[in-house]
């Protein structure tokens, strides 16, 4: 199949020379750089070169000694003339010798071979010249004119060099003029490479398709795959799907991509969430028994490990074993790391023992290193098996080339901190120093974090300051941990102190630190300081997240600062942050407290337009607002709307709001009716429910109802609180009532006349 026409349409960089085709083959297959082992041949080469160097070039043709050497040398291997040409050291001498040899070629016993090999050496010199174009064209013309067959090496050199000079047509001409039986895989590989590098993808694939045919005389080899796959992926010449199909076609010839390329491709597929496709590629290559190594499998194992797909990891390792692909030290690391992360430490230890000491495909032995030991020690610490972790550390110290490092000790420190053994963690730091391993910032952060989690903020501060004296400086994580800890105990002053210290230390705060400070300041209602931190956050190039906006809006609503509330909402809109249910609920509550029901309705409508359904908190805020201004009819209307038109059902809080409102108005019947409705709808009343009802009752006229409600609390295990006791003490002032109150406090029924007295009553009543 000719590819000349398709190329000539697109490239006119070189006008093809119009020569008639050779009547004979135009190539000669010879090893490119043969070694001359015979001493007599080496003697001939040395003697010939010395004679040439000692004879003026214009006297070569008439030199009888040189003529005699040509005759005597021709009885040796034709390789002699290749070596002689090569040793002349320059293109000018090499071409002159070739022309001399051609003139004397009638004296050569194996003329074609001798001239072919000598010409190959001249071509090698020409290609290394500063401007080789004309020289290479001349040599190619000489070969055609004199019917000197090119060696395979010379052919490949011409195709490659013409291609590099942008003379792709000339490269193809050299290839096309070869006899078909001389277009072997080596030559085709060079042609495909030249065409791909020059962007002639279709033409390259015409040559490649011939190689990939099932009965191809010259099938692809590993070099073919390397050339094609590297170029098409690097230049994005084919889609992933077409590359996968191409790999399959190579696989059918028993050819696999080189391990480095295949590993990168598998990794790319995994990164694009195509682990199943990566699996299929490796399965196809294994099915066709192509030579494979561990790295591509490691790439897929890493992906499966990140997804914690241990079952498929196990299947893949079994497949590797079936086709005799030996795992390597990286495989070991991936397996034990995944097993440890999934808390399957015993299996990780088992794999560790089974694989270490085994030989890899390159003949090396899998040896445990510090990373493996650190992974296992960390895994043991994460599941609280600290004693075994310590034992593994002792074993690690005895292992060759496995010296514990800061990571090792930091894993142990983290384990002890997780277990709350802070003093032991500090002892490990001392052991680090004894082993001449310097604690680092991770060490500091681990212990500071552990102390802060276990309510040891002061301990954390002392430890951090001691480490600073030893030259170990904190980083953003250190300060963020301390700031979070201070905010969690509402010690905002100290949080701001550590914020200032962080700036002094040259650490740039990240958004999380600003969010922590804003949260802490909002909790203690320090709006001016919160605004200052927001300004610092924006100066640092950060923006508020939705949670921070909601906290600030809540703070300004509590402070009745409507101006700042609107400012925050405007800022949110500029930043492209859409309000969520929390934002709307906060605003609805704010407007409700200010009796601005028009804005409340507008907010609820806007909420629905934004695709947000009002939540139970939304309804609670509005109902509470109506109740607070005595608009109980509107509150009940909205309450009933919840059951009819909304997916949100009233909860205990909403019922309590209404019960409390009716109780304040002395409407016990309506309040009690709502409590009974709670029972029917399986909404559990709490102590606030009963407190509201108790407040509405008068012991003299409604004493029996009061006692029944007390019994109901006992039945539902609803614990009374201080407010309950204060209300009941006012309602039950007589001696009999006080006995009942005491029984109620002890968890006994008080209304039933058949209720047995507690055996302890005799003592408690005196």
UniProtKB/Swiss-Prot annotation:
Disulfide bonds: none
Start-end of each PPR repeat: 151-181, 184-218, 221-257, 258-292, 293-327, 328-358, 369-404, 405-439, 440-474, 475-509, 510-544, 545-579, 580-614, 615-650, 651-685, 686-720
UniProt KW keywords: Repeat
Signal sequence interval, chain numbering: none
InterPro entries per record: Pentatricopeptide_rpt, TPR-like_helical_dom_sf
Family indicated by similarity: Belongs to the PPR family. P subfamily.
PANTHER family: PENTATRICOPEPTIDE REPEAT-CONTAINING PROTEIN GUN1, CHLOROPLASTIC, PPR_LONG DOMAIN-CONTAINING PROTEIN
Protein name: Pentatricopeptide repeat-containing protein At5g28460
Higher taxonomy: Eukaryota, Viridiplantae, Streptophyta, Embryophyta, Tracheophyta
């Amino acid at each position: 199949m000719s590819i000349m026409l398709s190329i000539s349409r697109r490239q006119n960089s070189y006008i093809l020379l119009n020569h008639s085709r050779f009547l004979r083959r135009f190539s000669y297959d010879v090893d490119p750089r043969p070694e001359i082992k015979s001493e007599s041949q080496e003697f001939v080469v040395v003697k010939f070169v010395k004679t040439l160097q000692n004879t003026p070039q214009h006297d070569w043709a008439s030199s009888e000694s040189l003529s005699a050497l040509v005759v005597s040398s021709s009885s040796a291997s034709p390789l002699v003339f290749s070596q002689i040409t090569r040793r002349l050291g320059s293109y000018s001498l090499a071409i002159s010798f070739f022309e001399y040899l051609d003139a004397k070629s009638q004296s050569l016993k194996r003329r074609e071979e001798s001239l072919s090999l000598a010409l190959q050496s001249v071509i090698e010199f020409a290609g290394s010249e500063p401007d080789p174009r004309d020289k290479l064209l001349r040599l190619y013309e000489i070969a055609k004119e004199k019917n000197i067959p090119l060696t395979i090496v010379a052919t490949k050199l011409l195709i490659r060099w013409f291609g590099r000079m942008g003379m792709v047509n000339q490269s193809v001409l050299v290839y096309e003029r070869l006899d078909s039986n001389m277009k072997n895989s080596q030559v085709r590989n060079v042609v495909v490479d030249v065409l791909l590098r020059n962007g002639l993808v279709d033409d390259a694939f015409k040559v490649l398709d011939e190689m990939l045919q099932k009965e191809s005389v010259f099938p692809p080899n590993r070099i073919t795959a390397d050339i094609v796959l590297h170029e098409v992926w690097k230049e994005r010449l084919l889609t992933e799907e077409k590359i996968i199909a191409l790999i399959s076609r190579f696989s059918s010839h028993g050819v696999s991509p080189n391990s480095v390329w295949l590993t990168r491709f598998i990794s790319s597929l995994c990164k694009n969430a195509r682990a199943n496709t990566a699996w299929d590629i490796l399965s196809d290559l294994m099915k066709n028994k192509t030579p494979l190594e561990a790295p591509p499998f490691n790439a897929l194992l890493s992906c499966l490990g990140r997804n914690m797909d241990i079952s498929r990891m196990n299947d893949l390792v079994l497949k590797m074993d079936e086709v005799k692909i030996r795992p390597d030290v990286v495989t070991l690391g991936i397996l034990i790391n995944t097993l440890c992360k999934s808390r399957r430490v015993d299996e990780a230890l088992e794999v560790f023992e089974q694989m270490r000491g085994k030989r890899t495909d390159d003949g090396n032995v899998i040896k445990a290193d510090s990373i493996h030991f650190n992974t296992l020690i960390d895994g043991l610490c994460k599941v609280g098996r600290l004693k075994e972790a310590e034992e593994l550390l002792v074993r690690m110290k005895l292992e060759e080339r496995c010296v514990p490092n800061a990571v090792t000790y930091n894993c142990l420190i983290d384990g002890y901190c997780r277990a709350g053994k802070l003093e032991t963690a500090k002892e490990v730091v001392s052991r680090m120093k004894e082993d001449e391993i310097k604690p680092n910032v991770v060490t500091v952060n681990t212990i500071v974090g552990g102390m802060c989690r276990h309510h040891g903020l002061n301990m954390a501060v002392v430890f951090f300051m001691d480490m600073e004296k030893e030259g170990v400086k904190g980083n953003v994580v250190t300060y963020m941990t301390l700031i979070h800890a201070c905010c969690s105990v509402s010690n905002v002053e100290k949080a701001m102190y550590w914020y200032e210290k962080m700036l002094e230390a040259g650490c740039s705060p990240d958004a999380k630190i600003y969010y922590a400070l804003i949260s802490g300041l909002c909790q203690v209602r320090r709006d001016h300081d919160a605004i200052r931190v927001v300004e610092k956050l924006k100066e640092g190039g950060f923006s508020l997240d939705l949670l921070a906006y909601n906290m600030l809006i809540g703070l300004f609503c509590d402070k009745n600062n409507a101006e700042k509330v609107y400012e925050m909402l405007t800022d949110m809109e500029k930043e492209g942050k859409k309000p969520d249910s929390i934002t709307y609920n906060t605003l609805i509550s704010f407007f409700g407290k200010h009796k601005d029901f028009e804005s409340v309705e507008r907010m609820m409508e806007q909420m629905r337009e934004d695709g947000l359904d009002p939540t139970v908190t939304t309804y609670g805020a509005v109902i509470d607002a109506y109740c607070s201004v005595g608009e109980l009819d509107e509150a009940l209307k909205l309450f009933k709307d919840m059951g009819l038109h909304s997916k949100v059902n009233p909860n205990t809080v909403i019922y309590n709001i209404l019960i409390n409102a009716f109780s304040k108005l002395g409407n016990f019947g309506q309040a009690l009716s709502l409590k009974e409705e709670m029972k029917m709808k399986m909404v559990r009343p709490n102590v606030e429910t009963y407190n509201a009802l108790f407040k509405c009752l008068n012991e003299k006229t409604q004493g029996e109802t009061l006692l029944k409600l007390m019994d109901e609390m006992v039945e539902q295990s609803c614990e009374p609180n201080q407010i309950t006791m204060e209300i009941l003490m006012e309602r039950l002032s007589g001696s009999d009532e006080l006995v009942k109150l005491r029984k109620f406090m002890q968890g006994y029924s008080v209304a039933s006349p058949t209720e047995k007295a507690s055996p302890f009553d005799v003592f408690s009543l005196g």
